[in-house]
From Swiss-Prot:
Family: Belongs to the DXR family.
Pfam families: DXP_redisom_C (PF08436), DXP_reductoisom (PF02670), DXPR_C (PF13288)
EC number annotated for this UniProt entry: 1.1.1.267
Binding site for Mn(2+): D148, E150, E222
Protein name per UniProt: 1-deoxy-D-xylulose 5-phosphate reductoisomerase
Entry keyword annotation includes rRNA-binding: no
GO BP of this protein: isopentenyl diphosphate biosynthetic process, methylerythritol 4-phosphate pathway involved in terpenoid biosynthetic process
InterPro entries assigned to the protein according to its UniProt record, in alphabetical order: DXP_reductoisomerase, DXP_reductoisomerase_C, DXP_reductoisomerase_N, DXPR_C, DXPR_C_sf, NAD(P)-bd_dom_sf
Keywords, sorted A to Z: Isoprene biosynthesis, Manganese, Metal-binding, NADP, Oxidoreductase
């Protein structure tokens, strides 16, 4: 008898959750076992009615009561303990880790400790605690499969998806669209509005990640992820601006060969690849018509995109705590920008100041990660007044 793969989707109401559920709708291979949401209870209720999960998780009791008033045939759990439970249940096979921000850290670790197949879209798990998460994955024989289009592309380009071929890799090259302001100089961005920063030319994404794309913070975080996912030194990671977002990333091998993964910019492709791995599943994605594209590439200038400069410097110095500071400061500053409390250029300007002024030892456990994160946010709040 055919057995469906049971999946927990952390962050089911976000853009990655949407694409994951779109894949599930098109196939008959997956059973949604648990769904979680932070604020959009109405949408979560609709998803519960459609997919009939056994569990749903919301952040607090008031949202639990609201969800229970909308749906009756699902067990509603609350808070961090609920997230960790649905990430580690014996019945589930796959955990889609798509919560935005450091809130995704503990449930991702819970899935790793339970030996689950983790589809990783939550950047912060690797950005803030990469050394700790990789240790947990290895120790518990879990699987960590990247969902970001760039890292999933690299995952597909590396022979056997393991580390036996690492000596053969000369360079991992991440591509970046460059965002909506890729052709503008910094002095032209003084009066950028949140609406302009969120208007990504190629991808449909949430507001925070759209701003991160425009500042190239998103790509800087992806450099950190690649560092941990593929066990390569910082000098073996490169970034190219590729406005068409068709070549999702590539690997250069020591014999001069380049292997790239291409496709239309649709998150269903990397998500389906991760969900079905080690096989491939059929999903409804537009075919790539090569006759319609002229693919162009250019170097990502570190002076123009200073987020890259900050992160590469942190990795070269093995200053992993500084990456926690960088990430926490960015989250606070982007929120301030979206609420029109600071100017667009201050996102990076203030982050440079904070990253330079705060110094911590590399964390030895997840509690220390959260402590560095908390202190950074408090410091940013004091700077912003």
């Amino acid at each position: 008898m055919f057995k469906k793969t049971k999946i927990t989707i952390l962050g089911a109401t976000g853009s990655i959750g949407d694409s994951t559920l779109a894949v599930i709708r098109e196939t008959n291979d997956f059973e949604v076992f648990a769904l979680t949401a932070f604020s959009n209870v109405e949408k979560l209720a609709e998803l519960c009615q459609e997919f009939k999960p056994k569990f749903a998780v919301v952040p607090d009791l008031s949202k639990k009561q609201k969800l229970q008033s909308l749906v009756t045939d699902v067990e509603v759990l609350v808070g961090e303990s609920g997230l960790e439970k649905v990430s580690s249940l014996a019945e589930i096979d796959i955990v889609m880790s798509a919560i935005v921000g450091i809130a995704g850290l503990k449930p991702t670790f819970a899935a790793a400790k339970a030996g689950k197949k983790i589809l990783l879209a939550n950047k912060e798990s690797l950005v803030t605690a990469g050394h700790l998460l990789i240790d947990e994955v290895v120790k518990n024989n879990a699987q960590l499969i990247p969902v970001d289009s760039e890292h999933n592309a690299i995952f597909q380009c590396i022979d056997n998806h393991d580390k036996k071929c690492l000596p053969e890799i000369d360079k991992i090259i991440l591509t970046a669209s460059g965002g909506p302001f890729r052709d503008k100089q910094l002095h032209e961005l003084t009066d950028v509005t949140p609406e302009q920063a969120c208007n990504h030319p190629n991808w449909q994404m949430g507001r925070k990640i759209s701003v991160d794309s425009s500042t190239m913070v998103n790509k800087a975080l992806e450099v950190i992820e690649a560092y941990w996912l593929f066990s390569v030194s910082a000098d073996k990671i490169g970034v190219l601006i590729h406005p068409q977002s068709v070549t999702h990333s590539m690997v250069r091998y020591v014999d001069g060969s380049y292997i790239a993964q291409l496709g239309v910019p649709d998150m269903k492709t990397p998500i389906a690849n991760a969900m079905y791995y080690p096989k491939r599943g059929s999903v409804n994605v537009e075919s790539l018509d090569f006759t319609k594209y002229q693919l162009t590439f250019r170097e990502a200038c570190f002076e123009r995109f200073e987020a890259l400069k900050i992160v590469f410097n942190n990795l070269q110095n093995k200053n992993y705590a500084a990456n926690i500071v960088f990430n926490a400061a960015n989250e606070e500053l982007v929120a301030a920008f979206l609420n029109k409390k600071i100017k667009y250029l201050e996102i990076i300007e203030v982050n440079k100041k904070v990253t330079k002024e705060l110094n911590f030892e590399n964390p030895k456990n997840i509690e220390e990660v959260f402590e560095i994160d908390r202190k950074t946010r408090e410091y940013v709040d004091s700077v912003l007044g």
